[in-house]
UniProtKB/Swiss-Prot annotation:
The transmembrane domain is composed of seven transmembrane helices that are arranged in V-shape. Transmembrane helix 7 assumes a sharply kinked structure. It comes from the Eukaryota. GO terms for cellular component: endosome; glutamatergic synapse; plasma membrane; postsynaptic density membrane. It comes from Mus musculus. This is Corticotropin-releasing factor receptor 1. C-terminal Ser or Thr residues may be phosphorylated. Phosphorylation at Ser-301 by PKA prevents maximal coupling to Gq-protein, and thereby negatively regulates downstream signaling. Residues 24-111, 175-189, 254-269, 332-338 are extracellular.
Amino acid sequence: MGQRPQLRLVKALLLLGLNPVSTSLQDQQCESLSLASNVSGLQCNASVDLIGTCWPRSPAGQLVVRPCPAFFYGVRYNTTNNGYRECLANGSWAARVNYSECQEILNEEKKSKVHYHIAVIINYLGHCISLVALLVAFVLFLRLRSIRCLRNIIHWNLISAFILRNATWFVVQLTVSPEVHQSNVAWCRLVTAAYNYFHVTNFFWMFGEGCYLHTAIVLTYSTDRLRKWMFVCIGWGVPFPIIVAWAIGKLYYDNEKCWFGKRPGVYTDYIYQGPMILVLLINFIFLFNIVRILMTKLRASTTSETIQYRKAVKATLVLLPLLGITYMLFFVNPGEDEVSRVVFIYFNSFLESFQGFFVSVFYCFLNSEVRSAIRKRWRRWQDKHSIRARVARAMSIPTSPTRVSFHSIKQSTAV
């Protein structure tokens, strides 16, 4: 139990030694609890140790397990852990009881706070890195007009949706204090609605990615007939009435705490969570069909368009499970085990905060069209500056006497 619990143990021993009546009563209660147990042969009799734990009648040679005491010298302990004591082969209890697993609840709360603060740091770090990467990707798609086809416009809008979601995440973290959270003012509810709207747009733009690839590869429908406004309606338009319906539900049935969380028995959050799960499942079906076609019909094809489709599919195959895993984690109960809870907190914090970074990497930084356009821009910039440098050097060379005399001779001849 550590140094301080050991000091408390010494004090408890002194107190118990001075009060034999209470010890005798505990022994009687422990003996009465052991009457129901059927133990034959050599055995250890029921006994209460100096901490107050009842060790029931047990066969010789057995290691007996008992829950940690709920209270010990005014301190609460975690009763889900156990203490251990051996019933020796001669039918007597071992003098030493192993309480090493028993931990103060105060210490557990401190550990939980430490893990919480680390998770907060991971969240801030991940969202900062993601936001920087997303902004760089956004500027690249904005500046590189030569690659502005419908496929890359969809990538660009997906990145924009993630930028807005990350930005509203920072707004929520920096403005919604516990006091504001409890007061449930109108502006904090609007901030929550905006964050949830951009959260939904992430999934619908991923759905747009899946629709485009499924149309081009599985349905073999010409992508020239697809229009940007169709995907704008899917990505930005459809989530809006969903969030409006959710906000109305919150206003009438769960209007508290800035619309974060939910009360037991109130399911208004499923108004926007349901469509997110639906488009996620549809995208998984799309990807299954796309991969099936790529593995059969397009394997031998080496056209540049097919290569781009394959790379887009690879990116979507990585990102869609990434988005899906992080969202499905909200429905998972990590359990009571401390290790599983800590792993769950860290894993969820990492995936949730670094999503934007992964989207930027797979759809922009690893995009061969983007990289090729950047290389061309870089070469043009180098050529332009090298020409300027050569001209500047030529202009800075002083005119030699030979050239001056020759020029004057030509002028005199012309006259």
